[in-house]
Design a protein with these regions (language model features):
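Generic recognition of long tandem-repeat/solenoid scaffolds
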Residues: 92-97, 131-140
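Short hydrophobic core segments
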Residues: 141-153
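Active-site substrate-recognition segment that forms the wall
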Residues: 1-3, 7-8, 13, 44-46, ...
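Short, well-ordered alpha-helix to beta-strand connector turns
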Residues: 5, 116, 143-144
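Dinucleotide-binding Rossmann-like beta1-alpha1 core, especially the glycine-rich loop
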Residues: 7-92
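A structural motif corresponding to the C-terminal end of an alpha-helix
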Residues: 37-41, 113-119
Length: 199
């Protein structure tokens, strides 16, 4: 799932355009961590990429305008009239600043290579997992803790069966839009994220 994720760090969220939880603490940490990783690995994986927000409804525009004047340092009222040639903009546009795009494909590839000597690629059958007084055991590996990264399959994990999951499987469509600046993210009912080679 991560390989088709958009890799966007957005400091605001939801229909009410509120600041993402703990963003003032997490954003500087994330930026420093990604920049340190790219310097260490000599690759480019993080890029400041503002979000051009196309208001899909009057309600969303009103929420944006309210947050803009009250408590959101990440919003900018820039009205991008030029977006009208690419999007339906009857409710206007705005901008979210301090957003970042992470090249997840490069990041995962470099990260996998970096930990390759500490990495086991194998099929994990949860019935082989043994809980012990000290932690867990799987095959010949003994550890204090286990971290599940099951994605959508977590719904089938017996350790999480009591949680009320709502599946949210995203889809990616790769398109080329002639003339649309690849230096921004565009968000309305869908999100358009620049990838590579003007895609």
């Amino acid at each position: 799932a991560t390989s088709v994720a958009s890799g966007v760090i957005n400091p605001v969220t939801g229909r009410r355009i509120v600041q993402t939880w703990m963003i003032d603490t997490l954003l500087p940490f994330a930026i420093d961590a990604y920049k340190a990783f790219q310097q260490e690995e000599n690759i480019k994986i993080i890029k400041a990429t503002p979000i051009k927000l196309i208001h899909p409804s009057l309600q969303m525009k009103e929420s944006f305008d309210y947050r803009l004047t009250h408590d959101n340092i990440y919003l900018n009222e820039n009205n991008h009239s030029s977006l009208g040639q690419y999007f339906n903009t009857p409710f206007g546009t705005g901008e979210i600043d301090q957003c970042y795009w992470i090249d997840l494909i490069q990041f995962l590839k470099a990260g996998r290579e970096k930990i390759s000597t500490h990495f086991i690629e194998d099929y994990f059958d949860i019935s082989d997992l043994i809980l012990t007084e000290q932690g867990v055991q799987w095959k010949n590996i003994i550890a204090e803790k286990i971290i599940f990264c099951d994605g959508l399959n977590t719904m089938n994990n017996p350790y999480f069966k009591a949680l009320p999951f709502v599946p949210n499987k995203g889809e990616a469509l790769i398109v080329k839009i002639k003339g649309l600046a690849p230096t921004n993210i565009y968000k309305t009912n869908i999100t358009i994220v620049p990838w590579k080679d003007d895609l």
